[in-house]
């Protein structure tokens, strides 16, 4: 089975900083065969952003995992598990990649917003510049996290 356009992927949020892809896969593998388990990390620091994705081979396995693991304690943290939204096809986002500045502007290290993130071009993805890096700004696959007029790609630039 080459690359299928159908994915059975869960979003897993609220993860402990210590949770890695291997422990995520181990926790979810009891529900079915896993294609991929991935913790999303910050591009600049390499630190976990506190969320990840688990992709199952079969839909039934994904549904079982969502039902059983949502609200479950993993590595000392109460996690949230939902069906992941499909990535945007890249259209509509252009060069803006996630709405510009995002949330925080205090030098907290996450001032780049979602940086495109999951959710694709133009959307806030999972970013939003929050301390944990998810659930803020545009939210889960949400709208734009821009300042006023809708960003603008080349205007203002990124805060580094």
Swiss-Prot record:
It comes from Cucumis sativus (Cucumber). Binds to small phloem-mobile single-stranded RNAs (ss-sRNA, e.g. small interfering RNA (siRNA) and microRNA (miRNA)) in the phloeme exudate, including viral-derived sRNA (vsiRNA). Residues 88-157 are annotated as: Glycine-rich (GR) required for cell-to-cell movement. It comes from the Eukaryota. It is found in: Secreted. The gene is SRBP1. Possibly has a role in RNA transcription or processing during stress. Binds sequence non-specifically to RNAs and DNAs. Mediates cell-to-cell trafficking of RNA interference (RNAi) signals (small RNAs (sRNA), e.g. small interfering RNA (siRNA) and microRNA (miRNA)) which regulate growth and development, as well as responses to environmental inputs, including pathogen attack; can compromise zucchini yellow mosaic virus (ZYMV) and tobacco rattle virus (TRV) infections at the early stage. CDD domains: RRM2_NsCP33_like. Residues 87-160 have a biased composition (Gly residues). One of its GO terms (molecular function) is siRNA binding. GO terms for biological process: defense response; extracellular transport; miRNA transport; regulation of defense response to virus; RNA transport. Pfam families: RRM_1 (PF00076). Belongs to the GR-RBP family. Residues 8-86 form the RRM domain. This is Small RNA binding protein 1. GO terms for cellular component: extracellular space. Accumulates in phloem exudates. PANTHER family: HETEROGENEOUS NUCLEAR RIBONUCLEOPROTEIN 87F-RELATED. The keyword tRNA processing does not apply. The glycine-rich (GR) domain is necessary and sufficient for cell-to-cell movement and to interefere with zucchini yellow mosaic virus (ZYMV) infection.
């Amino acid at each position: 089975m080459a690359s299928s356009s159908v994915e059975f992927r869960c979003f897993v949020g609220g993860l402990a900083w210590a949770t890695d892809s291997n422990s995520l896969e181990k926790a979810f593998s009891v529900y079915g065969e896993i294609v991929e388990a991935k913790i999303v990390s910050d591009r600049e620091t390499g630190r976990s952003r506190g969320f990840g994705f688990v992709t199952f081979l079969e839909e039934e396995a994904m549904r079982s995992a969502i039902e059983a693991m949502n609200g479950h304690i993993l590595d000392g943290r109460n996690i949230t598990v939902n069906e992941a939204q499909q990535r945007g096809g890249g259209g509509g986002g252009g060069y803006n990649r996630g709405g510009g500045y995002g949330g925080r502007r205090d030098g907290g290290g996450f001032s780049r917003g979602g940086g495109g993130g999951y959710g694709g071009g133009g959307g806030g993805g999972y970013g939003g510049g929050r301390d944990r890096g998810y659930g803020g700004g545009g939210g889960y696959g949400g709208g734009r996290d821009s300042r006023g007029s809708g960003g603008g790609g080349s205007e203002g630039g990124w805060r580094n």
